Amino acid sequence: MAGDYAVPMLSPTKLLIIGGAEDRVGKAKILKRFVKLAGGKASTIVIIPTASSFQAEVIASYSEVFTRHGCKTLDVINPADRIAADDPALANRINAATGVFMSGGNQLKLAQVFAGTAAGEAIRRAHQRGAVIGGTSAGASIMSEFMISLGDEGVTPRQRSTQLSQGLALLEGVIVDQHFAQRQRYGRLMSIVASSPNLIGIGIDEDTAIEVTDNESFTVIGRGAAYVLDCRRAITDAPEARSGAPLLVSGAVVHSLPAGSTFDLTKLVLTEFVEQHPDSGITVTVAASSRP
């Protein structure tokens, strides 16, 4: 019941968007960061395994790693369908969370169950009040307003190579793709942003995450890189190209951002790069030159 769950108020807003296949058994740097953002020993974390075909294993795995890194209070929310996701009791449990984590799996299933339901709206409210929302693979894609639910792989952008579904719109004006380099998803993300230049594409490698603060900037953590695709001023034949044809895209701006990069989502520029050299242990900070 609503009265059974105190609603914690936190600040600033945080998203932890993971490109999939993150380390869970070693140092688990990304998931450790998620627990810290959720409040560490004071955290209340809700796990949502709905996208996965191996839900028992997913629940056990994330429960173990979150507990290992300090979380004392865990809950699991796993509605079978949209009717179940509209249950106010589920929304109340999300209201009590300081962190919500969505697993990987079938992103179309995740969208069909949560987008536009009471549970989905509760996740949006949790983000707005400052609870950290984390997601990996499918759980990463659903954070944007529109998400890639199906799509071809490969480095060449092709016309109509993807299918979009409604996401949770936690990060508006952006479309997220995951397993980016490992599954060669550059082409499909570029085709979307070339066809919809109002959207900025963000691709994230495996065992890599972006930590988004107040929907204004993000910092990259993990073993790989994140990529920002900006086609606002690109030339493209997307309106005329036949289905499946390679797209003309000229003048797109692509940022390749390894761990330690901080990127401004409002100005679409790199603001800082912090690199720790493994041999010397010296940390080098490079402040990017500002541009109008």
Each model region followed by its residue ranges:
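Glycine/threonine-rich flexible loop motifs
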Residues: Q107-T117
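Portal/gating segments that form or line small-molecule/metal binding sites
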Residues: V46, S52-A97, M102, K109
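Catalytic-core regions built around general acid/base machinery
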Residues: N92-R93, G116-G130
